[in-house]
Amino acid sequence: MTTDPKMLELLVCPITGGNLSFNRKTQELISLKAKLAYPIRDGVPIMLASEARPL
């Protein structure tokens, strides 16, 4: 996934509604408030709490 700043502005954590950051190394979207990492599969962010891993 490319880290388009506009895309990151639009995406929010589905649990907290807070901002997300992109972890280039793990290819995940990180919610610091929820302490969760959302996976990106085939370039598509999976924004389901059930698919997120705890930080």
Swiss-Prot record:
InterPro entries: Trm112-like
Superkingdom as given in the UniProt entry: Bacteria
Pfam families, per database record: Trm112p
GO cellular component: cytosol
Gene3D superfamilies: 2.20.25.10
Family of this protein: Belongs to the UPF0434 family.
Protein name, entry field: UPF0434 protein BARBAKC583_1098
